[in-house]
């Protein structure tokens, strides 16, 4: 959360050029599951290269031990309870989802001229009004 706050705080600072960056958010991954953190069992050459050539943040903590609440926290910069995503993982039959009026990191980055995208598992609502296309 500290990093996300710092990132959003620094978005308004002038810069010669804006850096490109990728946030990789995975479920059920342990610290030692990547080669760049010492795994010899699981081969992760592309992520290892990103870690070697870019910046690695090693002290990030998640706001929840399960995917939907921790995903909501990363995307909004808020505690899961604040955005109503604190109770459980959202499954396809769930009627709740991330409120589309919440401002996400993508919204803030878009305001600063960044092109943003989200690939893979959304898991923050399965109904049209809670999907990221909104």
Language model region names:
Residues 2, 15-134:
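Formylglycine-dependent sulfatase
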Residues 6-16:
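Hydrophobic h-region of N-terminal signal peptides that target proteins for export
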């Amino acid at each position: 959360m500290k990093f996300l706050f710092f990132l959003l705080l620094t978005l308004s600072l002038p810069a010669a050029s804006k850096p490109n960056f990728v946030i990789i958010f995975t479920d059920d991954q342990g610290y030692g599951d990547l080669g760049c953190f010492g795994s010899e069992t699981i081969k992760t050459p592309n992520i290892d290269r990103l870690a070697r050539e870019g910046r690695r943040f090693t002290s990030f903590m998640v706001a929840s031990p399960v995917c939907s609440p921790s995903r909501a926290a990363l995307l909004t910069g808020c505690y899961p309870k604040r955005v109503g995503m604190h109770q459980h993982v959202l499954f396809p039959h769930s009627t709740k989802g991330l409120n589309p009026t919440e401002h996400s990191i993508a919204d803030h980055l878009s305001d600063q001229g960044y092109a943003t995208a989200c690939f893979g598992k959304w898991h923050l609502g399965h109904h049209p009004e809670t999907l990221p296309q909104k």
